[in-house]
Amino acid sequence: SQDNGETAYQTAKEVLKKYPEVKGILGTSSFDAPGTARAIDELGLKGKVFTAGTGMPAANAQILKDGSVSTLTLWDPANAGYAMASLATKILNGETIEDGVNLGVEGYESMHFSSGSTKVLEGTGWLKITKDNVDSLGF
């Protein structure tokens, strides 16, 4: 969608018309799930076609609650910020950053270097956002 909700909507609509057997669409841009949900609703496919993606809770609360989107994921920005600050502190203190480093933040307790990299760390700090928890996240 190139980070464009209208493009996500138009593309999803075209795909769903051309390939009616499609059961789900996963978006990677925060604009994909809302655009895809709009196409699903417009084509009368709510409850028949699944969509999920990334997105902010407050901006997507309605489409989660009405079932247009079942799940969104993202990193908690506060936790990600604390993890980055922890990593920066370790580096500034001269600590060696090794595979498995614990940054002391939930989801960032066992960081691993991305395949083939000694600079990019990956953790498990994903949040799963559903209609059941969307209002409790505060952002």
Q: Regions from the language model: what does each represent?
A:
Residues 53, 73-74, 130:
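Structural signal for conserved beta-strand scaffold positions within catalytic alpha/beta enzyme cores
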Residues 20, 45, 68, 95-96:
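Residue-level recognition of short, well-ordered coil/turn positions
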Residues 1-63:
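Hydrophobic alpha-helical
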Residues 66-78:
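Short beta-strand elements at the ligand-binding edges of bilobed clamshell
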Residues 50, 70-71, 127:
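Conserved beta-strand segments of alpha/beta enzyme cores
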Residues 43-44, 67, 137-138:
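Short glycine-centered helix-capping/turn motifs at secondary-structure transition points
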Residues 5-9, 56-60, 76-96:
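Hydrophobic alpha-helical segments within soluble ligand-binding/sensing domains
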Residues 87-139:
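Hinge/cleft segment of the Venus flytrap/periplasmic-binding protein
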